[in-house]
Amino acid sequence: VLGHPAGLFVLFFTEMWERFSFYGMRVLLILFLTAALTGDNPGWGWNAENAGALYGTYAMLLYITPIFGGIIADKYIGYRWAVVIGSIIMTLGHLFMAFDTQFFMYLGLGCLVIGTGFFKPNMTSILSEMYKAFPEKKDGAYTIFYMGVNAGAFFGMMLCGYLANNVGWHYGFGLAGVFMLLGTLQFWLAKPLFGTIGEVPTEEGRLAKAAAAKAELKEGEEDKPNPF
């Protein structure tokens, strides 16, 4: 499709729906926490300091868990299973947040942190492996991929924000979960398009990767001109 493997567009839409749900939820979180306890669309009535502290903690953890998710995928379960597991956990997280209760809000945020750890580093790992045979197309592939990121962020903030403001907070959070579920299902159904890319790693595969990385490093060092 457009000179690229069909798997690229599976990743495009999976990432787009994930970013839709992420940014759709993110744009609501602090507004919901700081909204008045009374009125047509009540929130939790937190002050800005406490709401910012919760959001900051959540954002910090989002950058920590991908380290562990990448290690687990690389050594044990493979990139594809990591994406599936992460997608399912994130879907549950968004749906939990739609209940608007303190228990489910914290449970949902915890699921999003864990799910992102599995999902985020391994999507781009699949994309990178897909283009090993034709690296000259990789730049174009990443451009298309990040168009999905931007499109998902734009529509997520707009639609979830509109629904939360005009219908109710839980509908906005729930819409994020619906689109995350959509991304999960389309990735699962399209798995055959990836062939062996991102499968559960074997010892032979790990050794081959290590050898290839060593060869690339050696080749790069040989190509460098001697400055002396």
Q: Model-derived features: where do they sit?
A:
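Central cavity-lining transmembrane alpha-helices of secondary-active solute carriers
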Residues: 52-73, 120, 154
